[in-house]
């Protein structure tokens, strides 16, 4: 029933928090509960997001969570969200990670975004970020009545939390069974990757990248013209021999390499 919490303190607004969470417990009606999709995929997304973003500093603090006992009533996340509200923590957004590895055969990768209308601003924010990085991907707001997840614990405490889900109609038929395994239940690593990429994009954008955490030492002998540039950029280096250039976005994505 334990929760595991990791905090990256913000450099400018340490008392404003962006929270990224998942549940680490698994449940099965048959006794065997491997939990590959529900919810190893969500935990993996949180860990990978933390790994990538740990290389940078952000103006707001980021909290990474792995909650216990979600399957028996959101126990771990309820306790934590209740505590956050009790001490007056300013959580600007919660991003839930729960089941992102099953793609219904024949479907294209998409995201079903679950949230109540009361937190529509963060739902709109998620869709706007998706439109920037993956404009071809469908993201649809849905109301899911057949189950619940840890975002609700934050919503009930007045925080804005959303739940990107694999498919509210055609989610893995193998969850809560001994067949929740890689293969039948987690059948699309590409979809898990896409959900994790969206996690990284949304968390890092809302947390506000601290530009000072991006080292410019290596650029001291390189000039750029014009700066900023729109269509054409000329780089001049004092280094002789072969030079390798990478253009990297603020989210750590390699945009161009030559």
Where are these regions (language model features)?
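C-terminal outer-membrane/trafficking sorting elements
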Residues: 217-258
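A non-catalytic alpha/beta surface segment that caps or lines the substrate-entry region
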Residues: 1-8
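Active-site-adjacent substrate-binding region
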Residues: 102-210
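Short beta-strand/loop motifs in extracellular/secreted proteins, especially
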Residues: 16, 60, 241-245
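Solvent-exposed loop/turn segments at secondary-structure junctions
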Residues: 11-13, 24-28, 68-73, 98-103, ...
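Acidic/histidine-rich catalytic neighborhood of metal-dependent amide-processing enzymes
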Residues: 1, 28-118
């Amino acid at each position: 029933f334990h929760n595991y919490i990791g905090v990256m303190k913000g450099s400018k607004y340490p008392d404003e928090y962006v929270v990224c969470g998942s549940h680490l417990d698994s449940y099965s009606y048959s006794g065997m509960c491997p939990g590959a999709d529900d919810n190893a995929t969500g935990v993996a997304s949180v860990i990978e997001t933390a790994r990538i973003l740990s290389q940078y500093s952000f103006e707001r603090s980021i909290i990474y969570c792995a909650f216990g006992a979600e399957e028996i009533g959101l126990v771990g996340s309820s306790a934590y969200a209740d505590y956050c509200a009790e001490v007056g923590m300013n959580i600007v957004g919660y991003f839930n990670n729960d089941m992102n590895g099953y793609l219904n055969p024949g479907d294209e990768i998409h995201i079903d975004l679950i949230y109540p209308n009361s937190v529509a601003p963060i739902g709109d924010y998620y869709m706007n970020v998706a439109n920037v990085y993956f404009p071809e991907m469908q993201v649809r707001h849905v109301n899911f009545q057949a189950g619940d997840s840890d975002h609700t614990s934050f919503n009930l405490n007045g925080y804005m939390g959303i739940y990107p889900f694999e498919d509210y109609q055609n989610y893995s038929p193998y969850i809560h069974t001994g067949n929740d395994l890689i293969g039948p239940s987690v059948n699309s690593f590409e979809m898990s990757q896409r959900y994790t990429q969206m996690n990284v994009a949304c968390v890092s954008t809302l947390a506000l990248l601290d530009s000072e955490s991006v080292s410019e030492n290596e650029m001291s002998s390189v000039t750029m013209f014009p700066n900023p540039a729109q269509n054409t950029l000329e780089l001049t280096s004092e280094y002789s021999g072969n030079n390798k250039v990478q253009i990297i976005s603020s989210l750590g994505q390699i945009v161009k390499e030559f």
